[in-house]
């Protein structure tokens, strides 16, 4: 059940008002007053709807209507009243004598609303606009809020997957390897690398001709220490091998041990057999506890 219509609207005229109709309406209201707008058309002899007569009188034919553009004070007052009353144009028009609600509505939609947008204000709330503009408003219902949450979660998941795929892609590692290669290449081309390049090269023939066994022998022979002592008119050279161990020198140490033992057995026996130990005990005390002692008799 809605509001009952003001008239039957059968055989009534529609469209713009003619000047003759305006004169009839103004003359009737000046003489009798408007009274009830439902019965006015029949009393005035107009083929118009009661609502149409009311709007025509209120918005155009009223004698106290102020004509012409709105002043700056009137526009400022409209903006202030709209912030309080919203789109209640009739209530706003009641605060501006001589201005109709239709005029104020047209003024707002054509000028004042655009002015607020250019100033960065929301025309509905008169608050500063968000940084992302009017297109992205805050969700107003639980459904829209949930949709916004799902959308943000989806965007975050896609960003995380794209980062992981970039880490596992071959192009990413090739870029890392290339960076490391460039790093070592820069070191090689620097002053440090130049110092290494200026080193004198080793003789390849010497390196290739030496076997592992010969290199071990030469190393151990470099560690030998010799001392000469006189035992009863004979010079004896005592060679002390270092304690460095080499897997290639085991056979050499066994041979030298056998030869040293044979020399001790062949050593001539004299009356003072212990003089050798008494005279050379200091030189034996200086020798390392581990090592091989070989004695070679020189005549």
UniProtKB/Swiss-Prot annotation:
Spell out the SMART domains in the cross-references. Answer: SANT
Entries under PANTHER family matching the protein: MYB FAMILY TRANSCRIPTION FACTOR, TRANSCRIPTION FACTOR MYB17
GO BP annotation list: flower development; regulation of flower development
- UniProt-recorded name of the protein: Transcription factor MYB17
Residue ranges the UniProt entry marks as DNA-binding: 37-61, 89-112
Q: Where is this gene product found?
A: Nucleus
Which intervals hold domain HTH myb-type? 9-61, 62-116
- GO cellular component term, pick one: nucleus
Please tell me in which tissues this protein is expressed: Expressed in the shoot apex, young flower buds, developing carpels and siliques. Expressed in floral meristem, initiating floral primordia and developing flowers.
Q: What gene, per UniProt, encodes this protein? A: MYB17
Single GO molecular-function term?
Answer: DNA binding
Q: Does the keyword Nucleus apply?
A: yes
Q: What is its main location?
A: nucleus
Mind telling me which InterPro entries this protein's record contains? Homeodomain-like_sf, Myb_dom, Myb_TF_plants, SANT/Myb
């Amino acid at each position: 059940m809605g509001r009952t219509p003001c008239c039957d609207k059968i055989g009534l005229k529609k469209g713009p008002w003619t000047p003759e109709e305006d004169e009839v309406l103004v003359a009737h209201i000046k003489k009798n007053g408007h009274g009830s707008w439902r019965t006015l058309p029949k009393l005035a002899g107009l083929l118009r709807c009661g609502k149409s007569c009311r709007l025509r009188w209120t918005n155009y034919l009223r004698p106290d209507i102020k004509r012409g553009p709105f002043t700056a004070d009137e526009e400022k007052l409209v903006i202030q009243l709209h912030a309080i009353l919203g789109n209640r144009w009739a209530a706003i028009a009641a605060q501006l004598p001589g201005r109709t609600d239709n005029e104020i509505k047209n003024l707002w939609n054509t000028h004042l609303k655009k002015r607020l947008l250019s100033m960065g204000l929301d025309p509905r709330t008169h608050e500063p606009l968000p940084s992302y503009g009017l297109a992205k408003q805050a969700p107003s219902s639980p459904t829209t809020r949930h949709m916004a949450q799902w959308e943000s979660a989806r965007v975050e998941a896609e960003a995380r997957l794209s980062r992981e795929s970039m880490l596992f892609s071959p192009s990413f590692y090739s870029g890392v390897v290339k960076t490391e290669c460039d790093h070592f290449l820069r070191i090689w081309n620097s002053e440090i690398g130049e110092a290494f390049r200026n080193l004198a090269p080793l003789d390849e023939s010497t390196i290739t001709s030496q076997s592992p066994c010969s290199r071990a022998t030469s190393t151990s022979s470099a560690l030998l220490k010799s001392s000469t002592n006189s035992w009863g008119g004979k010079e004896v050279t005592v060679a002390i091998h270092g304690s460095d161990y080499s897997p290639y020198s085991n056979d050499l140490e066994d041979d030298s041990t056998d030869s040293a033992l044979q020399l001790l057995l062949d050593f001539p026996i004299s009356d003072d057999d212990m003089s050798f130990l008494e005279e050379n005990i200091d030189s034996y005390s200086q020798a390392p506890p581990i090592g091989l002692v070989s004695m070679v008799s020189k005549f």
